[in-house]
Structures are given as structure tokens and as C-alpha cells.
Amino acid sequence: MKLLFVSPRYYPYTGGVEYVVKSIAERLVKRGHEVNVLCGKSCINKPEENVINEVSVIRWPVYAPGDAYHIPRMRNSLKRLLLESVKNYDTVHLHSVHSVLTIYSLGTLKDQSIHKVLTPHYHGTGHTFFRRIFWRIWKKYVRNVLTNVNVIHSVSEYEAQLLAMDFGINPVVIEHGVDDWILEVAWNPSDYVMYSGRIEKYKNIHRLANIVKHLNNMGIYLELKVFGEGCFKRKLKRRLDKIGIKYELKPPQTYKEYINYLSRANLFGLLSEKEAFGQTVNEANAIGVPVIVVEPWGLNFKERTRTLITKLSKSDEEVAKEIAAFLEEAKKQPKPEVLSWNQVVDLYFKILYSP
């Protein structure tokens, strides 16, 4: 099979969507399929092509203010490329309705007979005031192009509910997987709480720090390790200094180093207001690291052991008390069951890529 993926960005950028696309694309190549990726890159003036682990990648010039939107430049040339190249593919799999590059590509291909799959990675709205205003307008355009897709794939039950509510569609739900070797990694807890991902205000890392402070006051002495980049990083550092806990604030790690840190975390916390799924939670679950998440999106993990689901409306002190009890209980529970990426690829072929 010949497949084209459209993604906001691609490796070596290490965002959540890009990680998912890379995980699927490279496994398809290993199974003998031909895979190309069309993605955006904001610091170039003309398209670039390269091959990464046998996946052919075309990086298209985009505007990405605030590391968002991914608005394609040279749109006439992009349109010609898409219309010409789809003649050579069996399936095009587009990722993220929050990316203009993705929706522009889908609109360009709306009348083409190629099998089209869309994974929206949808979380309902934008993360800032301006982005929320923009999303109200953008949503109307997204609604129009969704009618031209053969299969809409949701990564979680919560995302599926949002898509049904906002667009009146019922997507196929297939959750993300993890690398097979991660399933063999043992949990060896140390004395820290961990967060890894984008450092944005809506991720509520500052609240996680407050919770660690309350745990320390309760006699549970843990530090906080934060890995990532984002526009809230400087403000977060000031808040961490003010809170007065022991912490480390580091840039994103290599994947193996990230997993090494994760396997030694006493607790992984993701208190984000909005997530389509939460891949870091998936990886923590696969290792057996106790995790705290929040409603509503955290309900994706309601059937999993060693997972505490709480509400952002609770005070940080209340959440700390929940965690104190949870950490004792989690040690007695079995490790959660998590799919591998190879199992997920099997489901993609069976459900998403079959005409």
C-alpha cells in the first residue's frame, strides 16, 4: 500500500501529533509499505525533502505564529503538488484539524477519489483568548470539509464525544499505543513527581507544584521534575522559585532518556485543562507509574489501574490528600493494560485503511 500522511510537523520536532505520525509511519515502512509525509516547517522559504528511517518527508514552508496554526505558504504550488501526488497513493491520512496545513490539504483533495482518513486530535477550542476567537471561525470551515472524509478516527472516547457534540459525527475510536520495549520497562520509583510536555499555562504545571508543596507539608517529601519548552516557561520558573520546593526544570529529553526518568517517577502528573488523549499518560501507564489526570479528558483512562482521576475545581490541598491515599493504594494494584503500536497498526489496517 502507498500512503501519504499530512501532519503539522514531523520528526525531529517532538510534539504529540508528530510522535504519533512517526510511530505509525515507520511501522508501516517496516511492513513493506511506501510512506510519504507532508508536513510544515516555519523557518524555510522553499520545500525541503529528506528521508528519515525510510520514510520520505516533504517539509513545506508555513507561518506558525506562537508555534501554532501552521498556515501554508506557496499555496498554489502546494495545491499542484497535492493534486498530482495523490494519483500515486492508495490512502491519505491527515492529522490535526487545528492545523491550517491539514485542513487546506483536505479541502484541496475533497473531490479526489483517494481514500481519505482524518485524525482530528480535537480538544474543543484554542488555548488562548485569541485562539478561542479564531477557533469559532475556523470550526465552520472544518465542518464543511469533514463531509469529504471516508473515515474519521478519534484517539479517545472523550474526543469522540466532543466531535459528536460539535460536528454531529460518530468517529471510529482507536487509542494510541506505545513502543513494544516500553511494555518491558520496570517501574523503579524514586523521590520525585514528573511532568513532561509543552509548558503552557493551561497545562497547570504550577498547580502540580503547589500540590507537591502540600505533599511535603504532609510529610511526603518529593521534588518536581519538569521537562519541556513553551511560552509559560519563564513564568513557571518564577512560580517554582516562589513556592519553595525542590525542582528541576529541563528541556525535552531524548525519548529513551525521557522513558528512563519516567520509569523512576513516584508519580506522573498531567493536570491539563484540555487534551485529546494524553500520550505521556499512556506511556506512564504502560510502565506502571502511578498517574494523576483530571476530568473531563482524564475519563479516557477510567478503566485503568494506578490512575487517579480528579477535578480541577478541587483545591490543591484536597488533591494532595487524594494523592497521598492513592499512592499507597496504587502499589497494591496490577500494571494497566496498554496496546503496543504494532497492535494499533493492525487496527488501522483493519478499520481505517480498508476501503
Name the predicted role of every residue range.
Residues L4, H153, E184-K213, K225:
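Conserved donor-binding/catalytic core segment of Leloir-type glycosyltransferases
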Residues N45, T91-S113, V117-T125:
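An aromatic- and histidine-rich active-site surface loop
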Residues L183, K314, E318, E328-P355:
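A charged, aromatic-enriched C-terminal amphipathic alpha-helix characteristic of glycosyltransferases
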Residues W135-I152:
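Membrane-proximal helix-turn-helix segments that form the acceptor-binding/catalytic region
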Residues K235-Q253, I309:
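Nucleotide-activated donor-binding/catalytic signature segment of Leloir-type glycosyltransferases, i.e.
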Residues E273:
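Aromatic "clamp/platform" in nucleotide-sugar-dependent glycosyltransferases that forms part
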Residues K41, Y158, G177:
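Carbohydrate-associated surface elements
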